[in-house]
Every structure is written in structure tokens, then in C-alpha cells.
């Protein structure tokens, strides 16, 4: 109402126009010797455990499969993920990462802080957009809906003399997985 607007204006202390804004998440720097968790949308309390990282090159990756040793125990990450491919990044330490985006120079100078890092969704990018936005849009557009990129073991069973066959049913193609056993128990599924 007019009375409400007048009351607001009379009691106004000050207004400041904001030019640059960004969504942010807690910053998680990739660090050798750290154990990262694979992303799991059923876990509450994110961002703990750490399931994403920002590298020294300001590339952001999502951990889709944790590195594991021959007995199925989680191992620390020792190889920093690199590259901006639309495919998964497999590192020598057994981790599998999904490249998400690069924090460009402009975003880094304004929103990258010691405790937080910017995130964004690119609706559309054109030839006048920063290269980081064009690459991010390419990555977003290459995402495959309902793609199986990891399998979590909830019960490894017992008594296996050899690795059982892993069958993936669905409407896609080329999905393969191999079971890893230790002591007669399935301890890992490698995609």
C-alpha cells in the first residue's frame, strides 16, 4: 500500500546496489593424502564428507568413485585430477572424478576466497562469453541423464571363490562393471 511504502521510505537507513553476486559452497582444496568420498545424493549433511575438490588450476571435480585397495578399504588420493574432458577422469590412485567447471579469472578475483568457492549454472554461452563459461556449457550439455557411473556395495556377501558377474540392466549401452573380491567377499565394483 502507499502507506506501507511511505513508512518504509521514512525509516530507510540506506540502500546499496550490488553489482556482482555468485552462489558459493565451502572450498575444498585437493590435497595429496586426503581420502575423498564418492558423491551420494542420499547422504545428508553435505558438504561433509568431502566429495568435490578445487585443484591448483582452479578446476572443480566431483568424486564419483573412491580409490580402494585390494581389500576394499578406501585409500587416500595421491594424484590430482587434471583436464576438462566430458568423460570421467580416472587417476592412478584409483579415484574416478567428473570435471565440472573451471573457476575463471573474473570469478576467482571476485568470489574465490579461502573458505568459499563460486558455483554457477550456465544457461547459455555465446562467442562473447568467457572461455570458462563456454567450456562449462559444453560439459553441462554432454551430461547423460540417468548414467550409471558408480556402484556402492551395501552388502558384499560371503563365500565367493571367484568374482561374480555384474549385470547392469537398463536402456543404455556399453555399461560394464567388474566385481573385486577379497576373502570371499565382494569389496569393490570397478566400472
Labelled PLM ranges:
Residues 1-60, 64-71, 77-123:
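Extended assembly-interface regions of large multimeric machines
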Residues 65-76, 156-158, 170-173:
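Acidic glycine-/aspartate-rich tracts in secreted/extracellular proteins
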Residues 93-191:
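Conserved, function-critical positions that sit in or immediately flank catalytic
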Amino acid at each position: 500500500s502507499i502507506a506501507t511504502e511511505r513508512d518504509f521510505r521514512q525509516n530507510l537507513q540506506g540502500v546499496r546496489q550490488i553489482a556482482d553476486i555468485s552462489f558459493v559452497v565451502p572450498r575444498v582444496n585437493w590435497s595429496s593424502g586426503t581420502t575423498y568420498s564418492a558423491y551420494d545424493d542420499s547422504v545428508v549433511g553435505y558438504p561433509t564428507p568431502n566429495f568435490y575438490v578445487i585443484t591448483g588450476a582452479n578446476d572443480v571435480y566431483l568424486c564419483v568413485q573412491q580409490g580402494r585397495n585390494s581389500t576394499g578399504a578406501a585409500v587416500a588420493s595421491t594424484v590430482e585430477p587434471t583436464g576438462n574432458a566430458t568423460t570421467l577422469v580416472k587417476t592412478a590412485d584409483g579415484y574416478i572424478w567428473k570435471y565440472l567447471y573451471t573457476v575463471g579469472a573474473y570469478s576467482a578475483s571476485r568470489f574465490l576466497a579461502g573458505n568459499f568457492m563460486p558455483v554457477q549454472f550456465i544457461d547459455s554461452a555465446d562467442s562473447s562469453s568467457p572461455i570458462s563459461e563456454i567450456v562449462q556449457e559444453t560439459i553441462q550439455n554432454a551430461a547423460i541423464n540417468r548414467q550409471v557411473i558408480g556402484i556402492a556395495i551395501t552388502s558384499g556377501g560371503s563365500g565367493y571363490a571367484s568374482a561374480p558377474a555384474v549385470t547392469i540392466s537398463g536402456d543404455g549401452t556399453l555399461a560394464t562393471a567388474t566385481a573385486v573380491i577379497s576373502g570371499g567377499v565382494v569389496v569393490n565394483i570397478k566400472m
